[in-house]
């Protein structure tokens, strides 16, 4: 349902430009991935599940690199690579407190100075998402979009 992407599209229009690199943590069927690719210079998407839709998307667009595996394994194996740095990190993996917190903490070192951290499912349905974000960024303003996407400027 494309209406579910209205908020992410608003986020992209407001904050993403065609010089930016994005790390997407959790791609599922690649619907949000395709939208991120439309706006950004380059998108690296990580997911532990392999979906044919992602393979088809990777063939269709020239600015997507999909990495299959666990977030921690892929990030740890690439963390010394200076080219594995991002202007925006979009977190949409598991939605419980522990996983959201871990996803944010392991990805933050990959964020370029002045980069943006964002994600999905900031809603009462997933209280762990909000709890982890507020704990890690206690003094940051959180911008919430209509599809429950969220964004923090990492100043």
Name each region found by the language model.
Residues 2-155:
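S-adenosylmethionine/decaboxylated-SAM
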């Amino acid at each position: 349902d494309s209406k579910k992407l209205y908020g992410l599209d608003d986020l992209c229009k407001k904050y993403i430009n065609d010089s930016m690199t994005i790390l997407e943590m959790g791609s599922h069927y690649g619907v949000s991935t395709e939208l991120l690719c439309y706006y950004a210079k380059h998108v690296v998407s990580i997911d532990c599940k392999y979906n044919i839709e992602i393979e088809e998307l990777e063939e269709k667009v020239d600015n997507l690199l999909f990495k299959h595996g666990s977030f921690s394994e892929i990030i740890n194996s690439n963390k010394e690579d200076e080219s594995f740095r991002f202007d925006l990190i979009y977190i949409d993996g598991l939605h419980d407190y522990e996983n959201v917190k871990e996803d944010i903490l392991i990805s933050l070192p990959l964020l370029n100075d002045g980069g943006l951290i964002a994600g999905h499912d900031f809603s009462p349905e997933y209280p762990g998402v909000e709890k982890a974000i507020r704990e890690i960024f206690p003094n940051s303003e959180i911008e919430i979009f209509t599809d429950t996407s969220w964004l923090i400027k990492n100043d």
